[in-house]
Amino acid sequence: MMSYDAETGIAKVKCQSQSTCGACSARETCGTESLSELNGKRGEHIFTLETITPLRTDQMVEIGLEEKSMLFSALLMYIVQLFTLLVATLLSSYISENELIRAILIFMLTALSFVMVKRYTRKLGQQTEFQSVLLRVLF
């Protein structure tokens, strides 16, 4: 945990995701670890959550998200963009024969879907079922 305000009950928690590459026997021949090393830091995320449990800085805590919200987020991030890409491709073939115009249209519609999903997820983040919760204090 990074910080905790006892008056408001708001805690800032830094999460670090870890790859399982370190325990894999095929690690030497697999390119996944090499690619993840190119990205630099592994996923560090900062979450803000409300809790009535008194906390101290540098405590290790476990947080969680509702499964429904995780599945819905995955749907938004992957399926919506894929569906938009497919629909844009089909639409562009009816609109123009010129491949450059088709490519620009596909790119613009797909980019628009990313923007719309980002705006929508900001609104979803305000709802309680899409906010992380403190499950327990580890130490």
UniProtKB/Swiss-Prot annotation:
Gene Ontology CC: oxidoreductase complex; plasma membrane
Subcellular location: Cell inner membrane
One Pfam family hit: RseC_MucC
UniProt keyword list: Cell inner membrane, Cell membrane, Membrane, Transmembrane, Transmembrane helix
Presence of the UniProt keyword Cell inner membrane in the record: yes
Family in the record: Belongs to the RseC family.
Protein name per UniProt: Uncharacterized protein HI_0589
Organism: Haemophilus influenzae (strain ATCC 51907 / DSM 11121 / KW20 / Rd)
